[in-house]
Amino acid sequence: MVGYIGNVDIGVFDAEVANSMSAELERQNTLLQMIASENFVSRAVLQAQGSVLTNKYAEGYAGSRYYCGCALVDVVENLAVERLCRLFGCKFANVQPHSGSQANQQVFMALLKPGDTILGMSLDCGGHLTHGAAPNVSGRWFNAVSYGVNRDTGLIDMDEVEALALSAKPSLIIAGASSYPRRIDFAAFRAIADKVGAYLLADIAHYSGLIAGGCYPSPFGHAHVVTSTTHKTLRGPRGAVIMTDDEEIHKKIRLSVFPGMQGGPLMHVIAAKAVAFKEALHPDFKLYAQQVLENSRVLAGVLSSEGLDVVTGGTDSHIVLLDLRSKGVTGREVSSSLERAGIVCNKNAVPFDTEKPWVTSGIRLGSAAETSRGLGVPEFESIGRLVAKVVNACSLGQEKMSAAEAEVRREVNGLVRSLPMSAFPVCEVC
């Protein structure tokens, strides 16, 4: 019999991967994780995702699989669907999409045909690649028209949305964003969609945890269909879901997901989604969402008081977007400097940005992950001052920038040492 290495620990069998995992744990533990699309999952979510369910192939849906031996994974998928519907108060849900981008594509496939017109937010004003950006499938398969924000306020220009909808007659309108910090008026979007006979897709990838926690407007009752990732403010594994109250749309989406765009679902990830949904149904999750919002508003306030340009002047979500043009520095420069100082964020386009996407004129900060770590208002006040110190130093030359980075790094070390992430060990070497 050929020897099987299935019972060998990763630290023994593959030290290179094990060491990388340990190093990544150390990185997450010792730096402030301020990327708005990231969060820290619980030990229970990690246990589900690292379970034996990864061994099971289960093409199809619960009760209608193409493989035998699926009775137990059916239980898991049904739990995920039931919990998700209960969490958002929707009638139908599909928990199989592997990612948010795929979920959006699956909606397009279900409701549109190539060449149809879609109306979504432009990338530089806060939209996502899948909302019609030229390099993306959504911008290549469809006639993509983009709306933006008011140049003075930074808020979505609903008059422009309506004018574009009336002239372009889109088949689908997308309400959602990846770097828009304010509330989205889903009811107003639906009214416009109804005027032109369009479907309304709400992409709540960034806001879903806040919606579940009652801290952000819900699209349900307005949008025909809703997509979300599960790993941002919802604090679950990397993946996505599609929800609707319309049974006919639900049936089309089922076929679009499988067999349209995916084969076997990732049952270990669906199990982790089910666990995350149960966590989000707990009363404590509302407190978490409230703290995420309070922390981001405190952060925005401190940054503004330190003389930095906060896009829209504040936030209604976990996102804080900084426009760096008045400082004469780029998002790439500042995000790199902040990382050296122990604060991890991402460079980001700001409204009407003229820099290249890999340079940008802004940075995006998020409060979700560090709120999960346990940081509150005092810590986020400190983080705001530390970010401002680095940003201001970036325009003063290499020597002052390096000095600021070193000073801030020492303060970050003190913050993270007081609140290590205890949920993370997933193997002996980690």
From Swiss-Prot:
<dbReference type="InterPro" id="IPR039429">
    <property type="entry name" value="SHMT-like_dom"/>
</dbReference>
<comment type="similarity">
    <text>Belongs to the SHMT family.</text>
</comment>
<dbReference type="InterPro" id="IPR015422">
    <property type="entry name" value="PyrdxlP-dep_Trfase_small"/>
</dbReference>
<dbReference type="GO" id="GO:0019264">
    <property type="term" value="P:glycine biosynthetic process from serine"/>
</dbReference>
<protein>
    <recommendedName>
        <fullName>Serine hydroxymethyltransferase</fullName>
        <ecNumber>2.1.2.1</ecNumber>
    </recommendedName>
</protein>
<comment type="subunit">
    <text>Homodimer.</text>
</comment>
<keyword id="KW-0963">Cytoplasm</keyword>
<dbReference type="InterPro" id="IPR001085">
    <property type="entry name" value="Ser_HO-MeTrfase"/>
</dbReference>
<keyword id="KW-0554">One-carbon metabolism</keyword>
<feature type="binding site">
    <location>
        <begin position="127"/>
        <end position="129"/>
    </location>
    <ligand>
        <name>(6S)-5,6,7,8-tetrahydrofolate</name>
    </ligand>
</feature>
<dbReference type="GO" id="GO:0005829">
    <property type="term" value="C:cytosol"/>
</dbReference>
<keyword id="KW-0028">Amino-acid biosynthesis</keyword>
<comment type="function">
    <text>Catalyzes the reversible interconversion of serine and glycine with tetrahydrofolate (THF) serving as the one-carbon carrier. This reaction serves as the major source of one-carbon groups required for the biosynthesis of purines, thymidylate, methionine, and other important biomolecules. Also exhibits THF-independent aldolase activity toward beta-hydroxyamino acids, producing glycine and aldehydes, via a retro-aldol mechanism.</text>
</comment>
<comment type="pathway">
    <text>Amino-acid biosynthesis; glycine biosynthesis; glycine from L-serine: step 1/1.</text>
</comment>
<dbReference type="GO" id="GO:0030170">
    <property type="term" value="F:pyridoxal phosphate binding"/>
</dbReference>
<feature type="modified residue" description="N6-(pyridoxal phosphate)lysine">
    <location>
        <position position="232"/>
    </location>
</feature>
<dbReference type="InterPro" id="IPR019798">
    <property type="entry name" value="Ser_HO-MeTrfase_PLP_BS"/>
</dbReference>
<feature type="binding site">
    <location>
        <position position="123"/>
    </location>
    <ligand>
        <name>(6S)-5,6,7,8-tetrahydrofolate</name>
    </ligand>
</feature>
<keyword id="KW-0808">Transferase</keyword>
<dbReference type="InterPro" id="IPR015421">
    <property type="entry name" value="PyrdxlP-dep_Trfase_major"/>
</dbReference>
<keyword id="KW-0663">Pyridoxal phosphate</keyword>
<feature type="binding site">
    <location>
        <position position="248"/>
    </location>
    <ligand>
        <name>(6S)-5,6,7,8-tetrahydrofolate</name>
    </ligand>
</feature>
<dbReference type="GO" id="GO:0035999">
    <property type="term" value="P:tetrahydrofolate interconversion"/>
</dbReference>
<comment type="pathway">
    <text>One-carbon metabolism; tetrahydrofolate interconversion.</text>
</comment>
<dbReference type="InterPro" id="IPR049943">
    <property type="entry name" value="Ser_HO-MeTrfase-like"/>
</dbReference>
<dbReference type="GO" id="GO:0004372">
    <property type="term" value="F:glycine hydroxymethyltransferase activity"/>
</dbReference>
<feature type="site" description="Plays an important role in substrate specificity">
    <location>
        <position position="231"/>
    </location>
</feature>
<dbReference type="InterPro" id="IPR015424">
    <property type="entry name" value="PyrdxlP-dep_Trfase"/>
</dbReference>
<dbReference type="Pfam" id="PF00464">
    <property type="entry name" value="SHMT"/>
</dbReference>
